[in-house]
A protein has these predicted regions:
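Single conserved hydrophobic/aromatic residue that forms the stacking wall/gate
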Residues: 1-8, 12
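Conserved catalytic cores of phosphodiester-cleaving nucleases, focusing on short active-site segments
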Residues: 36-67, 82-83
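Short histidine-centered catalytic/ligand-binding loop motif
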Residues: 62-74, 120-125
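Metal-dependent nuclease catalytic regions and adjoining charged, substrate-binding loops involved
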Residues: 85-168
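An active-site-proximal "capping" alpha-helix that borders the catalytic cofactor pocket
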Residues: 76-87
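A short catalytic or substrate-binding loop motif that flags glycine-/basic-rich loops and adjacent residues
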Residues: 5, 31-37
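Short N-terminal edge-element motif at the start of the domain
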Residues: 10, 14-17, 32-34
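Short Pro/Gly-enriched beta-strand edge/turn motifs at strand-loop
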Residues: 19-28
Length: 168
């Protein structure tokens, strides 16, 4: 229909802004005095319900199947959930289903010929952005606190501070 075509055209026009550094898609949270923004790789339209679908592109070169199930890939999932949250905060109707477009470099090609070949896999992920707002409030409380947060073994800054104390 004409309306669907117009919506798709609008999304297409905005894509470049959503991908551009220092623009992207963002929102100012006045009550927290924070500005949150991100640069989204791609936005698709679900033609069955006209909701936006967030797609994120990943590249690697490893043997075996690519997945999004490794413990460290929670950061990928959080990233896409923040993108969904940003679009919803900006008034867009966003599908819970998102996709990772994973490009895995093929290592066992017979010849290079100045060409990299990839196996491309599209991995669906049903995202849940309900944690984002509470996490931002927690972050703001931490920033406003007079006390430092507890150290974590997973924190690079904490590891750096521990090493500095050794020489201190």
């Amino acid at each position: 229909t004409q309306a669907e075509s117009s919506a798709a055209s609008d999304v297409y026009k905005r894509q470049e802004i959503w991908r551009t550094r220092n623009q992207g898609i963002g929102i100012e949270l006045k009550e927290l005095n924070l500005y949150i923004y991100g640069l989204v790789d791609d936005v698709w339209i679900n033609t069955k319900n006209d909701k936006l679908i967030i797609a994120d592109y990943k590249a690697t070169s490893k043997k075996g199947d690519v997945t999004i199930d490794a413990p460290w890939q929670i950061s990928y999932k959080r990233q896409i959930e923040i993108y969904q949250w940003l679009f919803r905060q900006n008034g867009f109707d966003v599908d819970d289903m998102s996709y990772f477009v994973y490009c895995n470099g093929i290592k066992d090609s017979k010849v290079f010929d100045n060409c990299l070949n990839f196996e491309v896999k599209i991995l669906p992920y049903k995202a849940n952005d309900s944690w984002v707002t509470p996490a931002l409030k927690e972050i703001k409380n931490c920033l406003n606190s007079d006390e430092l947060p507890e150290e974590s073994d997973r924190c690079d800054y904490c590891a750096y501070n521990r090493k500095i104390k050794l020489f201190g």
